[in-house]
Amino acid sequence: MAKFDAHLKCSFCGKSQDQVRKLIAGPGVYICDECIDLCNEILDEELLDNQTNTNNSQQVKKKLPNDNPKKCVPLELTSIPKPLEIKSFLDNQVVGQESAKKILSVAVYNHYKRLAWKVKEESKNSNSTDSQATKLQKSNILLIGPTGSGKTLLAQTLAEFLDVPFAVADATTLTEAGYVGEDVENILLRLLQKSEMNVELAQKGIIYIDEIDKIARKSENPSITRDVSGEGVQQALLKMLEGTIANVPPQGGRKHPYHDCIQIDTSQILFICGGAFIGLEDIVQKRMGKHSIGFTTNSDQNKVDTKKIIDPRDSLKNLELDDLVKYGLIPEFIGRIPVCAVLDRLTKETLESILTQPRDALVKQFKTLLSMDNVELKFEPDSVEAIANEAFKRKTGARALRSIIEELMLDVMYTLPSEENIKEFTITKKMVDNLFSSKIVKLPSGSKRIIKESA
């Protein structure tokens, strides 16, 4: 028995009982005094970190009192911008998408009217037990449109006009709690950071969740395997979209039982979800074209009507709830984003207007860049049209415009800062057609000169 005891070892460090001062036995395990000391040190360090985080959060609260100087949406009903005012501002920043801008203007106006109504009723009933007032529910927004059509820009412009915190989240990085990836609460942390950790201000903000179509479940029928980045994320987002008190870890990452969390009421936050929903047109066309495809169609008039119905450009205007369910969104999720706006695919004419009309148009941006080098940049009308035509061919929406102009202006911006004698440069249609490059000619003396080409 004594020989057997001599071979007892610590289950954690592997040292025998002869190498340590004390070996404590448990049900099938042993731990030495050195490992116990190490555990105590780890616990003391974690306790110290928790106290430090608590002190830091208290300091943040002292620095950010309720009377934060940063402005937010006034909750007086008469001060909330009217839908016509909101759309007018959107018109100055976003070209086209008239229907989507109208839907967004009304939805945003109603959302902040709802917040004003809530504040009014709370103040009215603070000294009364009567709570018979009508409760207004929140209506989140779903934007459906091809890539580069302006979904993110619309949401960002709304937040700029209303002067509220705005955060963008990518749905593709989200996973269900307990799996590798981001928890849905990290979306709220981004909004908090934009609000300088002011909870009251963040609760009046706007969150745009991009690529929402990427969390559609992989098949229409529920799967026996767990879909942690698809349907699982939709389930996790339900309460947040509807309105709940969410616990947000101030440092990000996973929630920890020993770490303090910031509580945010999401019932006042406006969620705008956007996605391209590639393939949704096919689902709509299949549903609408069933009755008039096949041998049962006898009249020529029916054939003409069928072509009109299944036109891909117009099919999403006839979108129904069942189409989104077939695409992979669960009904509970769709029910929490009742306002749906479909964005049009950008035409050549719209792309041409995007280049020149908005306040931050690309042509204006590059003119400003070259003006810093004392060079006046000009675009011939034909060159703007040629750039828009090339962007339309690439089928990536307005995003293609910047890449084309960057490629077109590369040699120009590389050489012009060193050419003090050039005060003006003109982009022509011929430059765009000739693989987007301007000619740089070497003179016999070794100096370089940019030759302007005429159309």
Swiss-Prot record:
Q: Name one GO cellular component term.
A: HslUV protease complex
Q: Which residues bind Zn(2+)?
A: 10, 13, 32, 35
Give GO terms: molecular function aspect only.
ATP binding; ATP hydrolysis activity; ATP-dependent protein folding chaperone; protein dimerization activity; unfolded protein binding; zinc ion binding
Q: Which residues bind ATP?
A: 146-153
Q: Which domain of life is it from?
A: Bacteria
The reply on keyword Nucleotide-binding is yes
User: What residue stretches are annotated with the ClpX-type ZB domain?
Assistant: 1-51
Q: Give the InterPro entries listed for this entry.
A: AAA+_ATPase (IPR003593), ATP-dep_Clp_protease_ClpX (IPR050052), ATPase_AAA_core (IPR003959), Clp_ATPase_C (IPR019489), Clp_protease_ATP-bd_su_ClpX (IPR004487), ClpX_bact (IPR046425), P-loop_NTPase (IPR027417), Znf_CppX_C4 (IPR010603)
Question: Entry's Pfam families?
Answer: AAA_2, ClpB_D2-small, zf-C4_ClpX
A Gene Ontology BP annotation from the UniProt entry: proteolysis involved in protein catabolic process
Q: Which UniProt keywords apply?
A: ATP-binding, Chaperone, Metal-binding, Nucleotide-binding, Zinc
Subunit and interaction comment = Component of the ClpX-ClpP complex. Forms a hexameric ring that, in the presence of ATP, binds to fourteen ClpP subunits assembled into a disk-like structure with a central cavity, resembling the structure of eukaryotic proteasomes.
Q: To which protein family does this belong?
A: Belongs to the ClpX chaperone family.
- Which PANTHER family does this UniProt record tie to the protein? ATP-DEPENDENT CLP PROTEASE ATP-BINDING SUBUNIT CLPX-LIKE, MITOCHONDRIAL, ATP-DEPENDENT CLP PROTEASE ATP-BINDING SUBUNIT CLPX-LIKE, MITOCHONDRIAL-RELATED
Describe the task this protein carries out.
Answer: ATP-dependent specificity component of the Clp protease. It directs the protease to specific substrates. Can perform chaperone functions in the absence of ClpP.
The name of this protein is ATP-dependent Clp protease ATP-binding subunit ClpX
What is the originating organism of this protein? Prochlorococcus marinus (strain MIT 9215)
Q: What gene is this protein a product of?
A: clpX
